[in-house]
From Swiss-Prot:
NCBIfam families according to UniProt: glut_syn_euk
Chemical reaction(s) catalysed: gamma-L-glutamyl-L-cysteine + glycine + ATP = glutathione + ADP + phosphate + H(+)
Subunit and partners: Homodimer.
Additional detail: Present with 3430 molecules/cell in log phase SD medium.
Protein name: Glutathione synthetase GSH2
Domain of life of the organism encoding this protein: Eukaryota
Coiled coil: none
Annotated source species: Saccharomyces cerevisiae (strain ATCC 204508 / S288c)
Residues involved in substrate binding: 128, 150-153, 228-230, 234, 285-288, 467, 478-479
A single GO BP: glutathione biosynthetic process
Cofactor: Mg(2+)
InterPro entries (UniProt xref): Glutathione_synthase, Glutathione_synthase_a-hlx, Glutathione_synthase_C_euk, Glutathione_synthase_N_euk, GSH-S_sub-bd_sf, GSH_synth_subst-bd, PreATP-grasp_dom_sf
Amino acid sequence: MAHYPPSKDQLNELIQEVNQWAITNGLSMYPPKFEENPSNASVSPVTIYPTPIPRKCFDEAVQIQPVFNELYARITQDMAQPDSYLHKTTEALALSDSEFTGKLWSLYLATLKSAQYKKQNFRLGIFRSDYLIDKKKGTEQIKQVEFNTVSVSFAGLSEKVDRLHSYLNRANKYDPKGPIYNDQNMVISDSGYLLSKALAKAVESYKSQQSSSTTSDPIVAFIVQRNERNVFDQKVLELNLLEKFGTKSVRLTFDDVNDKLFIDDKTGKLFIRDTEQEIAVVYYRTGYTTTDYTSEKDWEARLFLEKSFAIKAPDLLTQLSGSKKIQQLLTDEGVLGKYISDAEKKSSLLKTFVKIYPLDDTKLGREGKRLALSEPSKYVLKPQREGGGNNVYKENIPNFLKGIEERHWDAYILMELIEPELNENNIILRDNKSYNEPIISELGIYGCVLFNDEQVLSNEFSGSLLRSKFNTSNEGGVAAGFGCLDSIILY
């Protein structure tokens, strides 16, 4: 890049521009322990420049997202059948990962048995498929890191960092002589709007099920973490819901669910006790890992919500469809073919997969165990749960496995490491400090799918995200402290 690196004075000016634009436009996060001063937000960790991504790779990721949406909708539908392969697989996984998958599975079974349960046929999947661009074979190819089915974040802030970099370019802040990028090659995501649109569509679907006695103005309940640091990302969706779609929303923790909500015994409808507002959609921005459930009361709150007639985004089965075990099984063409019969679609999905091994007593599982212990440098060990910081990398794998009983190994998958290109022409800004180190970038593609027990009713690509991290960091979670938000310049 001809204008890189910037001089010290140029960099200082750019840092000031980034900070001022971010504060003006809400590109923000709360720092740790912000509760003592809730007015003390900080600028989200970001790159100063956009990162080059091959247009071919970006287009492939966008085009395949509706296929992934359809796939995971079909998987969820199938998991509801007690005699299905994936129902039985998840049942077995619940035994090996009793702390998390087992808890979610037991809640699902308890929901079905509850006298209070009122079945809601609609499900809303708000998904994100994450990729690294692999360069191993000399060509650039998107390879899936994971498919997220619950609490996908940064749709709101992603579009802001895209607009930040576009502003810096168009306002000649990168170079006073003029823009250094073709603005048409800068991706501007509409993910904050598109996720809100999906939530609003779910509200309309809920209303369409009701008789005239239904509340005319049901709302969306955001179920959020206590002391949520990433609140401004979520606020983008809340504001869009109200301003673009006329839909109100409320933020509730699991504590609030226990204290403030009730279910009508006859209809199963979910209401806020004090205001009697009817909740049409329960949208989870928490509940994706064990630390989100701090006590048995939190699990009880999740069960309470699942029993209601509100549409869940996601419900328990949809969340469980995103387990790493199912990701591993889908790399088997025979398993994938049960859900996607179209040969071209199936081939396009398979191209995005790397080798993933179980660690069970199957032939493939025994090979996975051998590789984990004898060739760990090529692999990452992943548990079922989401969120940054849960994975075990390379040479740390053997000692980690030796530290747990072998009967628990099948709660993990062994995934081939992807080898992405390094970008040495960018600068990360975090806490007003700049870091000029090689970075790796992960492309996220959002997708929203509304479906029932038999059909996919709405299926859309819903925007993009780019997150970058230092080459020396294994994890990439921005809120977890490992990475930063970035934007895309296509080439």
